[in-house]
Regions:
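Rossmann-like dinucleotide-binding domain that binds NAD(P)(H)
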Residues: 158-207
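Beta-loop-alpha module in the N-terminal Rossmann-like domain of NAD(P)-dependent dehydrogenases
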Residues: 51, 60-125
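Rossmann-fold dehydrogenase core element
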Residues: 120-138, 157-163
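Short strand-turn motif at the edge of the Rossmann-like AdoMet-binding core
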Residues: 109-110, 136-138, 166-167
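Hydrophobic residues in well-ordered beta-strands that form the structural core
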Residues: 6, 106-107, 132-134
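N-terminal Rossmann-like dinucleotide-binding module
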Residues: 1-60, 182
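Rossmann-like NAD(P)H-binding beta-loop-alpha module
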Residues: 142-161
């Protein structure tokens, strides 16, 4: 089993399974997925909030909880670190975790809030030979894979264009849009992206 430490013990780290979304296939949170897996062992969690640390500790029966994620990594030595904080600190934490020589990182979307941050995170992981993945998971969904197979088989004709419609935020939701289009087009190298976004406030802001 691979040992896992989680940074950020909120919704995606620990509690989203309890929200009762009818369309969600469980397990959904990283902690729940670790507990359900035969290949992963959840060993520790880190969060700035004492309340979230205590909730995580009691919910998942994990005694090793930390306020400082760097301390968690140094003391627990996890093989995988899952970063589930808010997006504005994702790249900063990802870079630090890679530089602490953690072998594998799972970083929730968005991996960064700018291309400059993304490039620095990528170069750091390549330099340290960190195995890296992020939360664009729809390419692993059976529905999307069925469409992918239909396109490749020619059963629905020749691929001419892919149009994605989604009422969502850029960093939270349209990451899925871009990755889905890429996946359905066999991950052909992207030459350019153009989109139209509304500047009106989003009706909700995910945590």
């Amino acid at each position: 089993k691979y040992s896992v430490g989680i940074i950020g013990l909120g919704r995606m780290g620990s509690t989203i399974d309890d929200e009762g979304h009818p369309s969600v296939i469980l397990p959904y949170s990283i902690a729940a997925a670790c507990k359900a897996s035969n290949n992963l062992e959840l060993i520790a969690g880190a969060d700035l909030s004492n309340e979230k640390r205590e909730q995580f500790k009691n919910k998942w029966d994990i005694n090793s909880v930390y306020e400082n994620y760097e301390t968690m990594i140094k003391e627990e030595n996890p093989e995988i670190v899952a970063i589930c904080t808010k997006a504005d600190v994702h790249s900063e934490i990802g870079i630090k975790v890679s530089n602490l020589n953690v072998p594998m990182i799972y970083l929730e979307k968005a991996i960064a809030c700018s291309l400059k941050e993304s490039d620095l995170l990528k170069s750091t992981c390549l330099k340290n030979k960190t195995i890296f993945n992020t939360g664009v998971m729809r390419r692993f969904d059976s529905v999307y894979n069925t469409v992918h197979k239909l396109i490749n088989s020619g059963a629905i004709g020749t691929l001419e264009s892919i149009i994605q419609y989604a009422h969502t935020t850029l960093l939270h939701g349209h990451i899925h849009s871009i990755d889905t289009i890429s996946f359905l087009n066999n991950d052909t190298k992207i030459k350019g992206i153009r989109g139209h976004l509304s500047t009106s406030p989003a009706p909700w802001e995910p945590l």
